[in-house]
Amino acid sequence: MSATRSTFLGSIFRTAKARILISPIARRSLPSPNFTSSRFHTSSSLRQSRIEGSIPRSFLPSIHVRFHSVSASTWFSSRRTSSQGRLASVSMYIQYSTSVPTRSLRRRISNRKKSSAKPILNVSKFHETISKLPPRFTPEELADAITLEEDPFLCFHLFNWASQQPRFTHENCSYHIAIRKLGAAKMYQEMDDIVNQVLSVRHIGNENLYNSIIFYFTKAGKLIRAVNIFRHMVTSKNLECRPTIRTYHILFKALLGRGNNSYINHVYMETVRSLFRQMVDSGIEPDVFALNCLVKGYVLSLHVNDALRIFHQMSVVYDCEPNSFTYDYLIHGLCAQGRTINARELLSEMKGKGFVPNGKSYNSLVNAFALSGEIDDAVKCLWEMIENGRVVDFISYRTLVDESCRKGKYDEATRLLEMLREKQLVDRDSYDKLVNVLHKDL
């Protein structure tokens, strides 16, 4: 009976001693050591006791972190054996993990600290900039002062100071240069404050100003905010604020730059298609960049037939001739689906117009020809790619060597590796990897 009582009192003593080391904020959030919240499990023999909110003595010197609320994510547990042989289990939620954080986690923490760190205003430089302005300065003179200033945070305070001056009103030039300064410095919260001021004034705004706002919102990843600015332009009664072809270019580029996931591109492609239809219905003639955005979007979302339809309509319907980017997008999409016949036809048409495929198109052709068993065409395309100064990636070399061995052309694969080594087209590490591929297939 005395041993049981001493074990129970020792557990409570350890709990009280551990709570001394916990901050008052965390102490209020932790459960109190009673029978309901701390969940003491007492059996007839009291062989095991589980205490929430306590720390074993062996861990007390090594833990120097501040404990926070129960919303902390890591479960810290430890077991220790008492001198009498009894087992005590101790567990607690803490905010930090004992494992080393990954590189991506460290990068996110660093970026979060940089974004949350508030810049400090240089007061002397601020007063010096104000002193250079004339007594009755105009918005153009303020815009020139903001342009010459390198500190974007000082520009933001200078803009706000000018807003408080009597008989001064901002115009498009001062709004525009301030937004460009803050957007280029990635001070999006301060930029958003100025954008709200622009939207609150009806007679302020033009196409260049709103295009810059949309551009920097897309750079910040705020697509919804950018689309709302676009809708404001469409419904604006000021004709100078209506969207132009450049506005649609910014939105197309932002929507199609969301990654290489075909499902994500399929979702965003619906928005691109509706924007393109709205652009045509509003009387804006699409140019080759807008049409290439459609072709690229269809290729990224694996709708190559729709991309070919736009390609055939470019000169007939929209009076735009396809350029090298159009052919590069289509060749890559056709090769990704293994349609080497159509890709070869487009390649011949592209060369007939004097265009040279880029490295991505050549690599796609080499891989597609090799995977379809056309080894000779793949090797020919490879040497043509090297002659045109395009960079061959390691995947193309490996695919060509691997598929040559599958077809039983070991001599051709060996000869290709020797030529690559003699012309120093691959480094030593890549050459050894290709030799291992050849020996593995042998």
UniProtKB/Swiss-Prot annotation:
Organism name: Arabidopsis thaliana
UniProt KW Nucleotide-binding keyword: no
Domain of life assignment: Eukaryota
Gene3D superfamilies: Tetratricopeptide repeat domain (1.25.40.10)
Cell location: Mitochondrion
Pfam families for the chain: PPR, PPR_1, PPR_2, PPR_3
Name by which UniProt lists this protein: Pentatricopeptide repeat-containing protein At2g27800, mitochondrial
Transit peptide: first to last position: 1-67
PPR repeat placement: 206-236, 244-286, 287-322, 323-357, 358-392, 393-427
GO cellular component labels: mitochondrion
The entry's keywords: Mitochondrion, Repeat, Transit peptide
Family, as annotated: Belongs to the PPR family. P subfamily.
